Amino acid sequence: MKGLIQRVSEASVAVDGETIARIGPGLLLLLGVERNDTLNEAKELCRKVLSYRVFPDEQGRMNVNVQAAGGSLLVVPQFTLAADTSSGTRPGFSLAAAPELANRLYGDFVAEASGLLGAGRVGTGEFGADMKVALINDGPVTFMLESGQRGSCTKM
């Protein structure tokens, strides 16, 4: 499971011209689910995202996590993060989870985040929808985080 986090001043996601979620200061997470991911990877990555220290402390160093900073989390499913880009000029998606598994694990991730951060501080995109994501990147600060099972996805 992969998550691209961006520290934001604000972020929102819209579907069919309607804003379905909006956050103020916090993290925008683009979440990619791979075919061998399980609930364990979802929980592990969630805890990693919420504890990752990307907000400034009193000395201006990145030393505070989103929870301690009082920030919010906007979770947007993005299957293209699971793409195989190792060869050629067209991405392959054989490493991406099937839609049913990806949707379930996306929901599990959101439930875990809501339980740990508080439901009022977690916004979501819409799985499978054509979404328009807007953000003001603060920094910019952007990191790719992955669950610990890296390397278990192999080509068939």
Curated annotation (Swiss-Prot):
Substrates-to-products reaction catalysed: glycyl-tRNA(Ala) + H2O = tRNA(Ala) + glycine + H(+); a D-aminoacyl-tRNA + H2O = a tRNA + a D-alpha-amino acid + H(+)
Enzyme Commission number(s) of this protein: 3.1.1.96
Cited SUPFAM superfamilies: DTD-like
GO CC terms: cytoplasm
Compartment(s) where it occurs, according to its Swiss-Prot or TrEMBL record: Cytoplasm
Biological function: An aminoacyl-tRNA editing enzyme that deacylates mischarged D-aminoacyl-tRNAs. Also deacylates mischarged glycyl-tRNA(Ala), protecting cells against glycine mischarging by AlaRS. Acts via tRNA-based rather than protein-based catalysis; rejects L-amino acids rather than detecting D-amino acids in the active site. By recycling D-aminoacyl-tRNA to D-amino acids and free tRNA molecules, this enzyme counteracts the toxicity associated with the formation of D-aminoacyl-tRNA entities in vivo and helps enforce protein L-homochirality.
Name the UniProt record assigns to this protein: D-aminoacyl-tRNA deacylase
Protein's organism: Marinobacter nauticus (strain ATCC 700491 / DSM 11845 / VT8)
Gene: dtd
